């Protein structure tokens, strides 16, 4: 946790690197384990577009993954982690491997915008967040199935989405969000800000206006105690 260090020691902040390019921290000291196949063993007709059944790491699995802590507060930033192709190669389930070493957090950014083959139940259980923030940039973020996975796996979780589309979704691609699912989305349509205070003891989450550029605070959650 010294590779990305604060400029000042005024605050008890650490950034623990969890994974990059398939090199995953073991949870002990600076020890890591290599999970991707050796270069000589990689087989793919077109590596940049490797399919799930090819022995080649997809770009998203190479994400830089980290756990950011401030006092008792922990935040998960899993980049574009996914589990595509895990039935063909166990090492492709890098999302779960990272979640297991990263452990519990207060808030997590949903892996890979909440698209298909991400945010699996076992990874969600490992993190057990009180809040999940989804950074969306198309109408199908997060996928309805993934949103449902989040709220059924974690009965007490609140979901916050930067842009939440509740209308019809492309036929054959995704289902319309149900009223029950929509009710679990607390903050949406704006910048999602997590403000941690009192040396990491407490935090609030808020939405800021993001259309006119005023950054006006639209809504703020109650104060939560960090675990």
Question: Where are these predicted regions, by residue range?
Answer:
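Cap/insert and terminal regions of metallo-dependent hydrolase folds
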Residues: 52, 57-61, 82-184
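Flexible, acidic/histidine-containing loops and adjacent segments that form or flank the divalent-metal
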Residues: 1-85, 152-158, 162-227
């Amino acid at each position: 946790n010294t590779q990305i260090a604060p400029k000042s020691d005024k605050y008890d902040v650490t950034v623990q690197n969890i994974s990059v390019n398939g090199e995953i921290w073991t949870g002990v000291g600076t020890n890591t384990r290599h999970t991707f196949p050796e270069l000589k063993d990689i087989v793919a007709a077109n590596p940049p577009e490797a399919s799930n059944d090819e022995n080649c790491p997809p770009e998203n699995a190479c994400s830089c993954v980290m756990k950011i802590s401030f006092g008792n507060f922990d935040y998960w930033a899993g980049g574009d982690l996914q589990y595509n192709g895990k039935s063909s190669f166990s090492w492709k389930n890098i999302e779960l491997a990272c979640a297991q070493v990263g452990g519990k957090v207060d808030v997590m950014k949903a892996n890979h915008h909440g698209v298909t083959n991400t945010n699996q139940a076992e990874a969600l259980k490992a993190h057990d967040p009180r809040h999940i923030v989804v950074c969306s940039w198309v109408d199908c973020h997060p996928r309805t199935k993934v949103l449902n996975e989040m709220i059924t796996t974690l009965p007490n979780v609140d979901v916050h989405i930067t842009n939440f589309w509740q209308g019809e979704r492309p036929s054959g691609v995704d289902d319309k969000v149900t009223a029950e699912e929509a009710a679990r989305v607390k903050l949406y349509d704006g910048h999602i800000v997590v403000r941690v205070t009192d040396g990491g003891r407490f935090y609030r989450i808020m939405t800021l206006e993001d259309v006119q550029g005023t950054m006006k605070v639209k809504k703020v959650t109650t104060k939560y105690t960090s675990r």
